[in-house]
């Protein structure tokens, strides 16, 4: 780039100190501007012939040196671009990330617990002996003691800030705080469990600070997670008095519990009688409205008998005609809905006996009776004319009043009259 910036004349080879005047060189190189590369071919031979007049030997040497310099420079630049030099610092990114993850997880697990009492609040937080120290790269040299103390102070400050952050997120507004941010959930209706509520919370909070698993009491869980529903005849072990009404308001205390049960259903109240769960009440599979529809057992029909209430709702059957004798049990005294078992079943569709025409409904009486002891009425007789030829009812215009056939004389099928 610097060479191109220094070229101010019309031809690139003039400022390199060739012998002779510039005009002579311009005239000599004038024909070489059109794509000449000065290689050992016919173009190079023609260039040598052009330069033979004015100091051809010196110009050829200078041109050859210039071309070799350009070639070597371009090759060096190409090699430098293709093959970069080795980096002075080698970084194993996988190992570095693993160390960073281990360091962060160690800081999260070794969060200093909160003091259990106000008197112990002034005690300084100590790092546990098993806690991992600040991870340093393996290839680095040992840092001085001053830098090590500064790094330890920064790590402790960071761990304290992280612990304060997560303890504030774990805080529940309605619960009582204990050591380590854990809350002691005390249930008033649990008898012996309520007496040791504070002791259980303190025991749960006294978890080793080096452990990374957060106890259940320290998590943001509803108090109903730690209670069991009471059953009839099974209690004592959990401390729940069996056979007594335990209200949801006694089991759940706090604003978050009220909101939780308001989301479930409006009937679950915390202080009213609608939220009382009675363990002694059995679950009724039928609602209250279904008990009204159920009648006494003696009025219900047998398994193979027709119900009394749906007599006119069933489809008519050929054996349900009035001529069929009644073979059912004697009915029970009492009228339900104005229909008794003494009254014969009214058919929804009229049969051949009730139809006015009598010719359109012989189909219902053509079935084979299901009960052999039930006599069926005789089927309606339909008159048919089986005489040869056309009947008089179908073609009345072909017959005279005296019964003489008016068709062609030689036509077959004429009436024998």
Swiss-Prot record:
InterPro entries: FAM181 (IPR029359), TEADIR3_omega_loop (IPR053819). It holds the Pfam family TEADIR3. Transmembrane segments: none annotated. Residues 104-147 are annotated as: Disordered. It comes from the Eukaryota. Belongs to the FAM181 family. This is Protein FAM181B. The gene is Fam181b.
